[in-house]
């Protein structure tokens, strides 16, 4: 079925209240927020909602919604300026999952590694192929932070090594490490859906017997790894730096990403006390920080 959406501009101070009003008083099925000025996003701390100074609020309605009623409610709301601008659009229904599947293609990272959708044939059967169905979890290889980590893993000697994937998401890094020769990988994530997606993808790739998955509260307390990867965000990388550093064996390696270039210098200071850091590698405003624990 088709849908109708209304988009109007708001500020960080009133965007959430307008979204609540659209949902509670006008019958919107959802309310979402978009950056109106394409400002870089800095992640919030846990429990905090971070919105842009200039925010678009989008309300989604079914095709039968009375948009005259919606507009009248908006015009009479104290949250809305008298001369507010808005845009109403009709959206044709799509099979979004199928459309996404059509646009997810095999991708090569480094010399040996390919990430392939599970429903497509691997282009190089003799290469190191990871078959991926990310489900609801983050990590397909298309984001610069994921690709930077995959390329780094492809350049390491992982044969017989123990790896920790801190924030495993879809399991893409963990499974890539196993396909590249790692003996054992521990995947940790705060999201049960990510744990399930990692488990499913590990089974699909025939490596589930070598992948141990944990929520943070269940992870082993005395484990260290030869290689640790953490593709999360700058805030958690700062906050959890003592934990992440403690997971790296003496002589082991660490790669972290999810960091904007402009955050790299600051984030590096949280790790340079215990690791000899490599030059930062950047791509599309994001970067990878890696190093060696003496």
Swiss-Prot record:
Protein's cellular compartments = Cytoplasm
What keyword terms does UniProt attach to this protein? Cytoplasm, Methyltransferase, S-adenosyl-L-methionine, Transferase
Q: Name one GO molecular function term.
A: protein-lysine N-methyltransferase activity
What reactions does this protein catalyze?
Answer: L-lysyl-[protein] + 3 S-adenosyl-L-methionine = N(6),N(6),N(6)-trimethyl-L-lysyl-[protein] + 3 S-adenosyl-L-homocysteine + 3 H(+)
Q: What is its main location?
A: cytoplasm
Protein name (record): Ribosomal protein L11 methyltransferase
Note whether ATP-binding occurs among the keywords.
no
Domain of life of the source: Bacteria
* HAMAP family in the cross-refs: Methyltr_PrmA
Per the UniProt record, the source organism is Photobacterium profundum (strain SS9)
The record's function comment reads:
Methylates ribosomal protein L11.
Its transmembrane ranges are none
Q: What's a single GO BP term from this record?
A: methylation
> EC top class, in one word?
transferase
Report the GO terms under cellular component: cytosol
Q: Coiled-coil ranges per the record?
A: none
């Amino acid at each position: 079925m088709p849908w109708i959406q209304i988009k109007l501009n708001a500020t960080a101070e009133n965007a959430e209240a307008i979204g609540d009003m659209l949902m509670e008083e006008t019958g919107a099925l959802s309310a979402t927020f978009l950056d109106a000025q394409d400002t870089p996003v800095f992640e919030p701390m846990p429990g905090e909602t971070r919105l842009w100074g200039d925010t678009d609020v989008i309300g989604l309605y079914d095709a039968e919604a009375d948009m005259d009623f919606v507009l009248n409610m908006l015009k009479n709301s104290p949250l809305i300026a008298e001369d507010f601008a808005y845009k109403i659009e009709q959206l044709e229904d799509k099979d979004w999952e199928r459309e996404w599947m059509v646009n997810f293609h095999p991708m090569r990272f480094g010399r040996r590694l390919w990430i392939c959708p599970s429903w497509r044939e691997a282009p190089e059967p003799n290469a190191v192929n990871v078959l991926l169905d990310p489900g609801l979890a983050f990590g397909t290889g298309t984001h610069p932070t994921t690709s930077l980590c995959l390329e780094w893993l492809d350049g390491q000697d992982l044969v017989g090594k123990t790896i920790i994937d801190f924030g495993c998401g879809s399991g893409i890094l963990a499974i890539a490490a196993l396909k590249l020769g790692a003996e054992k990988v521990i995947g940790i994530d705060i999201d049960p859906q990510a744990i399930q997606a990692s488990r499913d993808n590990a089974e699909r790739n025939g490596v589930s017997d070598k992948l141990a998955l944990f929520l943070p509260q269940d992870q082993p307390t005395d484990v260290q790894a030869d290689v640790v990867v953490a593709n999360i965000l700058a805030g958690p990388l700062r906050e959890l730096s003592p934990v992440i550093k403690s997971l790296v064996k003496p002589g082991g390696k660490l790669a972290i990403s999810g960091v904007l270039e402009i955050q790299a210098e600051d984030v590096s200071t949280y790790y340079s006390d215990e690791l000899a850091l490599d030059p930062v590698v950047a791509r599309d405003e994001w970067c990878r920080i890696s190093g060696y624990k003496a």
